[in-house]
C-alpha cells in the first residue's frame, strides 16, 4: 500500500508546475522536497499515519485539479485591486520583491553595503585602523 501512495505522490509532483519566478518560495518545489523527505526509502517507506497521508494527498489533488476554482467560480479574473493574474505574477516574482527590498533600504544602509568590507578579516582590519588612529 505504501508503494501505491508513493506512486500517487510522484505523479502529483510530476504534474504540479514549478514557477521559476518564485525561487525558494514555490509550492511545487516545496512539494517535491517534502515528498522526497517523507518517502526516503521510495516504495519501501513505512508510513506511520496512512490516514493522514491519504488526507494530505486528497487535499493536494483537489488544489491541483482546481476543484475550488470550479466549485466557487468568480465572475472576473481580477481581485479587489483590479490587477490581473499576470500582473500579480509579475509583482510576486522573486526579482520584483528583491527590487522592492532594495528600494526600501535607507541611504545609510546602501552606503554601508557599498563601502563596507565583505570578508570578516577585512572588517577586523578596518576596525583596527579606525581604533589605532590618534584622536584629536
Swiss-Prot record:
Reported function: Required for the assembly of the ubiquinol-cytochrome c reductase complex (mitochondrial respiratory chain complex III or cytochrome b-c1 complex). Plays a role in the modulation of respiratory chain activities such as oxygen consumption and ATP production and via its modulation of the respiratory chain activity can regulate skeletal muscle differentiation and insulin secretion by pancreatic beta-cells. Involved in cytochrome b translation and/or stability.
Entry keywords, A to Z: Membrane, Mitochondrion, Mitochondrion inner membrane, Mitochondrion nucleoid, Transit peptide
PANTHER family per the UniProt record, alphabetical: UBIQUINOL-CYTOCHROME-C REDUCTASE COMPLEX ASSEMBLY FACTOR 2 (PTHR34260:SF1)
Top-rank taxon, per record: Eukaryota
InterPro entries: UQCC2
Localisation: Mitochondrion matrix, Mitochondrion nucleoid; Mitochondrion; Mitochondrion intermembrane space; Mitochondrion matrix
Description of how the protein assembles with itself and partners: Interacts with UQCC1. Forms a complex, named COMB/coordinator of mitochondrial CYTB biogenesis, composed of UQCC1, UQCC2, UQCC4, UQCC5 and UQCC6; stabilizes nascent cytochrome b/MT-CYB and promotes its membrane insertion. Forms a complex, named COMA, composed of UQCC1, UQCC2 and UQCC4; activates MT-CYB translation. Forms a complex, named COMC, composed of UQCC1, UQCC2; UQCC3 and UQCC4; mediates MT-CYB hemylation and association with the first nuclear-encoded CIII subunit UQCRQ.
Any one of the GO BP annotations: positive regulation of mitochondrial translation
Keyword Iron-sulfur carried by entry: no
Keyword set includes Transit peptide: yes
Organelle targeting peptide span: 1-13
Pfam families: UQCC2_CBP6 (PF20180)
Tissue expr: Widely expressed with highest levels in brain, liver, kidney, heart, skeletal muscle, thymus, testis and pancreas (at protein level).
Protein name: Ubiquinol-cytochrome c reductase complex assembly factor 2
GO cellular-component term (any): mitochondrial nucleoid
